[in-house]
Every structure is written in structure tokens, then in C-alpha cells.
From Swiss-Prot:
Family in the record: Belongs to the metallo-dependent hydrolases superfamily. HutI family.
CDD domains per record: Imidazolone-5PH (cd01296)
Biological-process GO terms, alphabetical: L-histidine catabolic process to glutamate and formamide; L-histidine catabolic process to glutamate and formate
Originating gene: Amdhd1
Protein name: Probable imidazolonepropionase
């Protein structure tokens, strides 16, 4: 007998829908009270999409004669949407644990960068690594993210800086997209740094004349799927003009603009992003008041990275100001050799403590708003009928434990589910 549905999550103490009216993002007063059902159940169909969410008794009656491939008793537990990590650099070779010691001794990000460390160190090792080596380490990192509750990950290239290695990184992301259970959003980040021996203008020319046309060709053939274009818009890296040229080139070929801006110096990157119709801008530690207003008006998402501010001892992004002005605030781990954090629950905790976000604001920023930053909030980021059945089940009677708890989340998370299939069970 064939099952009529894939999964029933029944009798949960709480089911956190996040949204209940098909919202693509949450801002302002909508963030104060997320949609939460007490004593509820969730049904996922064989197509991997959510078929019903509602009070347990109603669901039980509605689906009484039907069968399920799997039923999970969620009594005393909470069901939340799978978490969305809106900013990661997960494909690379070359550990940089030695740089952590330098930072603790007082070296800045730019000190290390200028001494040949930082991105340059990783670039050398990533260029030398085989595709298989990169895939194996990437797969392990995704596994760690998944065990901390992440089901949709933005993944950047950017440690090649030459066409050959950038494509190698994007092929690794593409292979993972096809073979693994997590949802991935691929970002071409060839303008992550200026390669040795080139000026920023020469690097931009190379990207526009060679990298982007090749990407377009590979996308057209179905060999690669790239979603976003990224540039590190920063003093001493890519200035506003070269950033504009590269982003416009990517936009012309249908890529969403999603870039690093206003991190170490005020660059007016937020104003540029709003003008170009960017989907998202990350970092924003040094964003201007005008930039915040422009992003709110343009519905351009701010991807804030509390791990980076914490590890580099930067000033915190002004999350409260952005939230109060109506900016769509999202969160990311910024996982990279410089910020070695896999865990979105940890990111949410830091966002609450260091950036003064509330727990509902942080959860929305790590679900529906992070999905919006990737242009995927119509399919991901909330537990609503018709959306992908990505969820986590935590062994706690209130959902806030996911953020309140500082570390040890693999003990709290009992199940991780994508498209209605259990991909991790404690």
C-alpha cells in the first residue's frame, strides 16, 4: 500500500510558523509576535511540500483515514522552520588557525591581509587543492551546519580570484546542490579581493570580459546554477565605481545582487545597492543613516553577521536602527576561515546579546528574512501550506530555547527535516 503522505509531525507543544499569511519578509510590528501554534501538527506530502499546519485535533480528524511514510510524536517538543544561513564562504582549503593568535595579539584584519595572510593565504591553498578535496571538506562543513539546524545555505566562491579556480569552486557547490539534501544558493564572488599583480580596475575588467560571459555560457548549458553576484566593496579592495560595474554586469545576466558593503569603512555601499535594486547587502557595520533609509525604501535586505563583529572586535552593526527604520534584517554565520562558526542558533544568540535584537526578531532574521535575502522566501523560511517541508524539532517546551541556549545545540535539536524527509536524527 502506498503512503498518501510523507510525514506527520504530531502533537507538538509549539509549532512556530513564523508567518501565517504568505508574507515574503517581516519588518516593524510584525516582528513582535511571530505566528506560533500551541498543541499543533504538520503534514508534508510526498512532493516534499507542506499540506497542512494546524491544531493537533483538527489535523488528526482531517487526515484520519490517511497513511504516512513517517510519523513523529512531537509531544513536549517544538517544531520550527529549518534555519537559513544567508552568508557563508564554505568552499576553501588552508586552515588559518594561526591568524587567530595574531588577532588576539592585536593584529587587525587589514594588517594580516597586507602581510600576505587572510584571503590571499586561502586563495593560494584553494588554487592548489583538487576538486575532490574541496568537495569533501565542503560536505563535512555542510553536515555541521545541518546538525545545528540549517537547511538552506548561501554559498560563495571567492577564494580563486582567477577564472579557473572560481569555476572549480562553483562546480563543487553545484555538485553538492545535486547530491546532498540541503538547499543551496550559489554566489559568484570573484571580486572578493584584488588578485596579486592586478589593480582593482584590471580585476574588474577581467571579471566583466571573461568571468561573467563564461558563467553565462555554463548556466545556459545547465552545467552550473548561479543565483547571486557578490563584490567586496571596501577601501583598498573594490571602490564604489568598480563595484558598480561588476554588479551591473552580473545583474544584466540575471544574477541577484547580494554583496559585502560598508564593513570596515563607510563606502556608501548601501546607497549603491538600493539604487541598483540589490536583493541584499551584508555586513553594514559602517552604514550611514542615508544608506539605512535607502535600503528600507528599496526593500533591500541587510544581512548582519554578529560573528564577524565579535571575532574582529568591530563595532556592532546598528541592528536596532535598521529594524526601527523598517529595513528587512536577516542573519548569516559568515562561516569562513576568519570566522569559524557553523551554528545559526549561536548567531541568533549573539545577535540578541550584542546587537540588541529580540528573540522573535532574531528567529525571523534567520528564517523568513534570510530566505528573502536569497530570493527564496516564496518557498523557504516559514511553515506554511505550499512551502518546502524543511523543519527542525527541538527537545524543549518553548521555541526560545533554541536562542536562549549558548552552544550545545546538537543536544537540543532532535531532528532536521528537508522536504519532509528526516536527514538527521539525534
Amino acid at each position: 500500500m502506498t503512503s498518501s503522505h510523507r510525514l506527520l509531525l504530531e502533537n507538538a507543544q509549539q509549532v512556530v510558523l513564523v508567518c501565517a499569511r504568505g508574507e515574503r519578509f517581516l519588518t516593524g510590528s510584525a516582528l513582535r509576535s511571530l505566528a506560533v501554534l500551541e498543541g499543533a501538527s504538520v503534514v508534508v506530502g510526498t512532493d516534499g511540500l507542506i499540506k497542512a499546519v494546524g491544531p493537533a485535533a483538527v489535523i488528526q480528524k482531517q487526515f484520519s483515514g490517511e497513511t504516512f511514510e513517517e510519523r513523529i510524536d512531537c509531544s513536549g517538543k517544538c517544531v520550527l522552520p529549518g534555519l537559513v544561513d544567508a552568508h557563508t564562504h564554505p568552499v576553501w582549503a588552508g586552515e588559518r588557525v594561526h591568524e587567530f593568535a595574531m588577532k588576539l595579539a592585536g593584529a587587525t584584519y587589514m594588517d594580516i591581509h597586507q602581510a600576505g595572510g587572510g584571503i590571499n593565504f586561502t586563495v593560494e591553498h584553494t588554487r592548489q587543492a583538487s576538486e575532490e578535496e574541496l568537495f569533501c571538506s565542503f560536505q563535512q562543513r555542510l553536515q555541521c551546519m545541518m546538525r545545528a539546524g540549517t537547511t538552506l545555505v548561501e554559498c560563495k566562491s571567492g577564494y580563486g580570484l582567477n577564472l579557473e579556480t572560481e569555476l572549480k569552486m562553483l562546480r563543487v557547490i553545484e555538485r553538492a546542490r545535486r547530491e546532498l539534501h540541503l538547499s543551496l544558493s550559489a554566489t559568484y564572488c570573484g571580486a572578493h579581493s584584488v588578485p596579486k599583480g592586478k589593480t582593482a580596475v584590471e580585476a574588474a575588467d577581467d571579471i566583466i570580459s571573461h568571468h561573467l560571459p563564461r558563467l553565462k555560457e555554463l548556466s545556459r548549458n545547465g552545467d552550473l546554477h548561479v543565483d547571486n553576484i557578490d563584490v567586496f566593496c571596501e577601501k583598498g579592495v573594490f571602490d564604489l565605481d568598480t563595484t558598480r560595474r561588476i554588479l551591473e554586469g552580473g545583474k544584466k545576466m540575471g544574477l541577484q545582487i547580494n554583496f559585502h558593503g560598508d564593513e570596515l569603512h563607510p563606502m556608501k555601499a548601501a546607497e549603491l545597492g538600493a539604487e541598483l535594486g540589490a536583493q541584499a547587502i551584508s555586513h553594514l557595520e559602517e552604514v550611514s543613516d542615508e544608506g539605512i533609509a535607502a535600503m528600507a525604501a528599496a526593500r533591500c535586505s541587510a544581512v548582519l553577521l554578529p560573528t564577524t563583529a565579535y571575532m574582529l572586535r568591530l563595532k556592532q552593526p546598528r541592528a536596532r536602527k535598521m529594524l526601527d527604520e523598517g529595513v528587512i534584517v536577516a542573519l548569516g554565520s559568515d562561516f569562513n576561515p576568519n570566522a569559524y562558526c557553523f551554528s545559526m542558533p549561536m548567531v541568533m544568540h549573539l545577535a540578541c546579546v550584542n546587537m540588541r535584537m529580540s528573540m522573535p526578531e532574531a528567529l525571523a532574521a534567520a528564517t523568513i528574512n534570510a530566505a528573502y535575502a536569497l530570493g527564496k522566501s516564496h518557498t523557504h523560511g516559514s511553515l506554511e501550506v505550499g512551502k518546502q517541508g524543511d523543519a527542525i524539532i527541538i527537545n524543549a517546551s518553548r521555541w526560545e530555547h533554541l536562542i536562549y541556549q549558548f552552544g550545545g545545540h546538537h543536544e537540543l535539536i532532535d531532528y532536521v527535516i528537508t522536504k519532509g524527509k528526516v536527514i538527521y536524527k539525534k
